[in-house]
Amino acid sequence: PSVRRQRQMCIRDSVTLCWHWMAPTQTEGKRHFYTEKTDFNLKQALENPGSAEYQGLLHDIDLICAELQKLQEAGVPILWRPLHEASGGWFWWGASGPKAYQSLWSLMYDRMTNVHGLNNLIWVYNGQDPKWYVGDERCDIIGDDPYYTNGSRVAYYFDSANANRFKTCYKTSQNKMIAMTENDFLPNLNRMFQKNTKWLTFCTWCREFVCVMDESAGWGVTTPEYSGKYASADELRTVYQDERVVTLERLNGSGGYGYACAG
């Protein structure tokens, strides 16, 4: 959504933002966030601060900061989740390994915090591997995106609290809250509490994970109809109405939508 729309949506709430950063490559037709669709080499860019690629990193960060500044001026706190799912390698910011990723995170953190003075960002690390961790001093929350292979309900029923993924996050740092920053199936609240895997938040992804796709309207467009593939309308209501889940509506009476906190 546009910054104006974000401000309208979140004037009394918080918002979560994830940046699908198009690689600042100089090759025409190669600006993309998927590793396989770009020729951008993060390691080489970071090793050559005078290069067009490195300057491209700074340029893009500065552009994003200008937009985030508008939300700061509007008093909107942001759960800021950049450079997500890095250890998977499918995004260019994770394709050069953990050291390059950590350097890029530090560059972004320093520029946003110390150069642009952004203080409304709650930094969410989503590298999904303890070896990639950026350090307690440069993030506030640890996030994980537990998708089940091929949308398997069998796998979901086997570990519907995502306990193993939670434990991996805990190994990353014992000083941070742990959030389910993306998910397909809804977390099983009873299992969560039984296994003491109390995710701070969950965020069911869009598109077919909730609604039926509208193929005629373009990529990512959905109809108002629930798909039922990952969560039926009844399942959604059951989880969101559970007294153990704190929605924004319950938190401040705003009637807004967004993250649900399992407390």
List each model region and its residues.
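Aromatic- and acid-rich polysaccharide-binding/catalytic face
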Residues: D129-Y156, C203-C206
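Aromatic-lined carbohydrate-binding surfaces of glycoside hydrolases
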Residues: R12, T16-G50, Y54, A74, ...
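Aromatic-lined carbohydrate-recognition surfaces of secreted/lumenal glycan-active proteins
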Residues: R81-L83, S87, W105-K131, N175-L186
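An active-site-proximal structural segment forming one wall of the substrate-binding cleft
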Residues: L42-L79, L104-H116
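Alpha-helical scaffolding within the catalytic cores
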Residues: L63-E67, Y125-Y133, S160-T168, D184-M192
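Active-site groove signature of glycoside hydrolases
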Residues: D60-S96, N126-Q128, E137, I142-P146
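Substrate-binding cleft of secreted/luminal carbohydrate-active enzymes
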Residues: K176-G263
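Single conserved hydrophobic/aromatic residue that forms the stacking wall/gate
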Residues: P1-I11
